[in-house]
Amino acid sequence: MKKRIAIVGAGYTGLTIGYRLSQAGFDVTIYEKENYAGGLASGFQLDGLPLEKIWHFLYMSDHDALGLAEELGVKKYLAFHDSSVSTYYDGKLFPFSTPLDLLRFKPLAFWNRIRTGLVALYLQRLKNWKPLTHVTALDWMTRRAGQQAAKVIWEPLLKGKFGEYHDKVIMSWLWARISIRTRSKENTGEKLGYFKGGFAVLTDRLKEEIEKSGGRLRLGSAVVSIVNKEGRGIDIKAGERSDTYDAVVATVPTGVFGELIKSNKEVGNAHVERLSAIDYIGAVAMVFTSDQKISPFYWHNINDPKIPFLVFLSNTVLTGEDVTGGKNVYYVGFYASHGHAYFSQDEDSVMSEWEKGIKDMFPGFDPSRIREKALFKFKHAQHIVDLGYEEKIPAYESVVPGVYLANFSQIYPDDRGINFAIQEGNKMALLIQKKFGSLQRTDGR
């Protein structure tokens, strides 16, 4: 008889686990509280275009994601495009893609530009990142790159990304961000990958393959508890329905996982508190189409506190108009703690405030030429990698027998992203197969 496996969460980690295990002969059911799959990379339609609710792309070094796309037959829809980066500071936009751009970056004194470049080169070549776990990114950059570079470049980016946690994030996290971008670059510069048809192309194929192998996706099913029935399987309760499985893999945020398993005898209050020790920050993203080409750059880092968001992206500049149907597609994003006003404000007021910010950056921007727009809010967008983080990382096998956890908090020192979600899914699928006797290896290796 097939072993019954439940997966909680239909993001890319959960979908990858479900795909691998259903291919290997397991009876798979995936629970997802939302009415859609894909997690943060989930798609929607705007102005007739398939888009993501928050910006996503692949690096050329994203081997797990590229391998899965090849395996599923959708790599033909993926193209890599030249990226272009700028930094907005003190009311001006500066190119920021190449070493030469850094040398021309006048907000820094000339020697500090040289110093910043040398620090970046050092980090790109650094292999032993372990010493960076004991110092915050802001402190390390202040000491190594200098106070001016820290104030102009790094502190605004950390504040925009982590808000109140900006001075707590450790340097090993920032090293990993710099490292992956270095690995993804060719001699011609950074290239980023995007699917024609959006990431829904990959999400839909995963869903199709899971269902073709007999797996089930229960969308709109919020799991409220996971309980080991002491020799009689693992019980999952979603709404008024309970089902029993041989094993359960949760792909939810770590603190949420603690709440789901807290009624098991192996889980005391201290363990729930330990799981909730990892803090998360949320994200708010606006997507809009316009008949205006606002900027020649794809990525805009906002290092100016007068602008009310962290990043501004022009997807059309990256992908070209053939992917976006001749329309200009833009993303505006901000990371915020759960108590931030953006999470309680109505969508129109947030978007109106951000449109004024875009107007401040680009005086020629005309909000009346926006064709369609949408706003999305995510409460668990990014885990906080702070001092002592290594001691907080949860194990893949929980203290409850037969219950497992796979999420972004375990990929340290790397940061979240589609490739790492798929990588974690591959790892967990192999772990489950080993526990129950592997039927076949299905990770393409």
Predicted regions: what they are:
Residues K3-I30:
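N-terminal Rossmann-like FAD-binding beta1-loop-alpha1 element of flavoenzymes
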Residues T13, Y36, G255:
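Conserved Rossmann-like nucleotide-cofactor binding loop
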Residues S22-Q45:
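Glycine-rich FAD pyrophosphate-binding loop
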Residues A24, A222-Y331, Y335-F343, D348, ...:
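Mid-domain catalytic core of redox enzymes
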Residues D47-W129, P156:
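Dinucleotide-binding Rossmann-like beta1-alpha1 core, especially the glycine-rich loop
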Residues G67-A79, V85-P95, A145, A149, ...:
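Feature captures the FAD/FMN-dependent oxidoreductase FAD-binding
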Residues L108, L118-K229:
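Active-site/ligand-binding neighborhood in enzyme catalytic cores
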Residues N315-V317, E321-R445:
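Conserved flavin/dinucleotide-binding core of flavoenzymes
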